[in-house]
């Protein structure tokens, strides 16, 4: 018994020493932000990291409620999916709130992504190994991604706080941060997407280096969705129940529109027409099969099995 006690003490001591060594990091071998943006490879890797925050929309745990709404998942064995299907998903059943969401947690994830995108935009011009055109395109990618992540927050939480081009202040107190209004959020998001679209390429010329990266159609297509989202009654006067009309910020300013603006529907339609007028996207048809029945079958199958086709505007590989 005494021997066993000594063995246990010895192992615990080794564990303590290991933890001590593990926690003693040497930060001298880590790159500064200036060093990151001094080289092409590290600058490109920083941009690639921004793409890493794009949600997996097939995964309900990555802020996608689509799998919860049908039989994509067997909801009986997935408690949170069943809550959505039964209409019982709310704060009291899941503990959902802004800074801590056990299952659907985009809050901290997207604000980290937003801050990293702003950092990229602020420093990309320091990389002289990239041409001026390359820097402008990469900056447009980051600008679109930042707006897209703001939109994902807006979809779940409504009006949120906008940092604009300011890098996040870690010392700022939460009580001094106030929500922007719905119109301010939508106006910023859609303008950022529109501005990015003016620079991004219309089509993917080199699939080996550009596949999966954002294009003009991606930016305009997502902008169209943003404006359509903002035109719906929930964010456009609150419908017959006046949803959100009583919500104000700390200054007493209403954060939801107080009445319906029909022009928002017109703006959403015009945004969708801009995507159509690109003349890039169309229904996919199999190009090799001659039998009409097999051609129809293969055309439908290839929409899901081919890595890229004419119907895809934004895609993420799995």
Task: Outline where the language-model segments fall.
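Membrane-proximal, proline-rich intrinsically disordered regions
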Residues: 19-68
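Short coil/turn linking the two alpha-helices of tandem helical-hairpin repeats
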Residues: 154-155, 161, 229-238
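Conserved, well-structured interaction surfaces
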Residues: 44-62, 80-157, 172-211
